[in-house]
């Protein structure tokens, strides 16, 4: 799996889903990730992208690219080209490139379901859409769906039934306040995403307009924030757990030779809730959720402090062995292996002069391994292993998550996490 930002909630859900469905099939998941989406092509981006050169296509049955999360077509094309050379199938999750397998959310049908729910189940015919950015593909597509459903229901469309909120709060506030000033409030606001729907509810509340008693409001995407808004927002969930399930099913067919359609559409789930007058079907324990958020924040603070402290200690080390021992005494490192290239181990070599190799050497060096006793010293291992004690981890069917270690555009090694 190739993607960026594993800490992003959507990406995390997808990895967790794949891990669950793959484990049932006795498959292994290797995740190659970057911290940024690689859009700007900075030296740091180029250094991070070296992680994708770690992929061993000789032992890879399929490559999944979450292409909405990798913004560099150069990097994606490079991965696809190498897959093609090895006859390794490529699956695009979230995209539709020609000549490859793809899984996509049927955004149009999901958005149409929201509009039909408002018209059919709540009897509303006076609707106003808060679209995204004018000219944006997603925004224009949802406007087209809005027009289509209105036509289906015999409701005449006019251009003044659409305002633009640019997918975020401030332009949405401006758009709704303009409608209030012009005394043009509709019976229902259909918003192109959840952020704008939450904002609409806030502006209406500030003007003593009740939701849903006076005006219905709906969103789209199913983000976490809608569970805590007042009222809770009716939306449509693009579930990455569903995406993971369908990915595994597609691979079943692919490996079994039963693949007939290269494109899989996943219909988002309608989530009726309070902002349209329905009951919330997914109540949430806010105190438990807040406790989890607080724990994440405190952990983030503690680990940031620990990273800064060990970075300062490393600056005082005289050799690579001392560096390894500093990690041995760092309590916040676990379930991970740190690997360096030979250039980083050999003090006579300037690593910057060998950056073009990108892990091409036959040998790599384990700097430390948090789950093996006495493993806090450099140790050579074969490049094809990619991970010392790899069989032990693979037998557990735990996803391996790789990140490049780089300084600017110079790849110096990588870390591999194997969280249970």
Give the location of each predicted region:
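PAS/Per-ARNT-Sim sensory domains
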Residues: 171-174, 382-386
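Helix-loop-beta substructure at the N-terminus of cytosolic sensory domains
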Residues: 316-353
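A short, aliphatic-rich beta-strand micro-motif
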Residues: 388-406
């Amino acid at each position: 799996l190739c993607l960026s930002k594993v800490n992003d909630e959507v990406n995390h859900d997808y990895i967790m889903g794949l891990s669950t469905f793959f484990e049932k099939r006795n498959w292994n998941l290797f995740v190659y990730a970057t911290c940024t989406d690689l859009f700007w092509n900075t030296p740091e981006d180029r250094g991070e992208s070296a992680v994708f050169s770690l992929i061993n296509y000789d032992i890879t049955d399929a490559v999944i690219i979450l292409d909405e999360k990798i913004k560099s077509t150069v990097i994606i094309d490079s991965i696809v080209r190498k897959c093609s050379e090895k006859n390794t199938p490529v699956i695009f999750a979230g995209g539709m490139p020609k000549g490859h397998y793809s899984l996509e959310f049927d955004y149009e049908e999901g958005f149409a379901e929201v509009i039909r729910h408002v018209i059919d189940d709540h009897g509303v015919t006076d609707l106003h859409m808060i679209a995204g950015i004018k000219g944006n593909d997603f925004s224009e597509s949802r406007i087209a769906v809005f027009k289509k459903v209105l036509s289906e229901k015999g409701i005449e469309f006019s251009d003044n039934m659409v305002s633009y909120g640019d997918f975020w709060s401030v332009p949405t506030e401006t758009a709704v306040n303009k409608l209030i000033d012009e005394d043009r409030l509709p019976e229902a606001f259909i918003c192109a995403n959840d952020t704008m729907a939450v904002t609409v509810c806030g502006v209406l509340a500030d003007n003593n307009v009740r939701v849903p008693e006076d005006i219905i409001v709906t969103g789209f995407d199913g983000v976490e924030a809608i569970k805590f808004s007042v009222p809770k927002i009716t939306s449509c969930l693009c579930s990455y757990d569903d995406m993971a399930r369908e990915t595994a099913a597609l691979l079943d067919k692919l490996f079994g030779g039963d693949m007939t359609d290269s494109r899989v559409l996943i219909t988002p789930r309608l989530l009726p809730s309070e902002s349209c007058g329905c009951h919330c079907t997914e109540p949430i324990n806010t105190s438990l959720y807040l406790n989890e958020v607080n724990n994440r924040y405190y952990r983030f603070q503690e680990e940031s402090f620990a990273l800064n402290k060990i970075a300062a200690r490393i600056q005082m080390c005289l050799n690579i062995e001392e560096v390894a021992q500093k990690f041995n005494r760092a309590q916040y490192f676990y379930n991970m292996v740190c690997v360096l290239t030979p250039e980083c181990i050999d003090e006579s070599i300037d690593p910057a002069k060998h950056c073009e190799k990108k892990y091409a050497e036959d040998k790599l060096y384990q700097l430390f391994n948090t789950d093996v006793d006495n493993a806090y010293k450099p140790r050579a291992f074969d490049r094809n292993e990619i991970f010392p004690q790899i069989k032990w981890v693979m037998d557990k069917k735990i996803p391996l998550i790789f990140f490049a270690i780089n300084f600017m555009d110079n790849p110096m090694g990588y870390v591999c996490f194997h969280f249970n």
